[in-house]
Amino acid sequence: MLLYKSYKNRYDGWVLPKGTVEKGETHEQTALREVKEETDANARIIKYVGKSEYSFYSFHEQIVKSVHWYLMEAEGYHSKPQKEEFFVDSGYYKFHEAYHLLKFPNEKEILKEAYEEYKKLKSKNQWGIRQRR
C-alpha cells in the first residue's frame, strides 16, 4: 500500500494519493498522473475500487470533492514525496500498517475494499500478471 505524509495546513498525516481531474483527462489518467506526481511511483491500474466524497470549508464556503479510487500495481518499490506540495515522506506499507497510519476514515474504508480485491485476485493467482490494455 503506497501512502504519503503531508504537513500542509490541517491535513497533517498519512493519506492516499489523489488529485483533481485536469481538462481532457479520464479518472484513470488522473489517478495514474497523481500517483506519479505525488510519490514518483510508476503504476498501472488493475481495477476500479469505488468512489468517495468529502467536504471542507474554504473562505466560509463548503467545497465537496469526489474521489475515484483504483487498485494499482507499482512497477517497483521506489517512491519519493512531492516536496512542492508539502509531502514529507512516502512509502509502501503492509495493509495493517497502512490502515493504522491513514488519517481519514473514508480512506481507511477504501483501503479495506482495495485490499479485499487484492486478496481475491491473489487467491486466483491473478495478481502480478501483466494484462494487455
Region spans (language model):
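N-terminal strand-loop-strand
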Residues: 1-16
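Generic cytosolic/nucleocytoplasmic N-terminal low-complexity/intrinsically disordered segments
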Residues: 4, 17, 64, 82, ...
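Functional cleft and adjacent loop/helix regions within the main domain
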Residues: 17, 23, 132
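Unchanged
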Residues: 21-109
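Charged phosphate-binding loop/patch that engages nucleotide di/tri-phosphates or the phosphate backbone
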Residues: 100-133
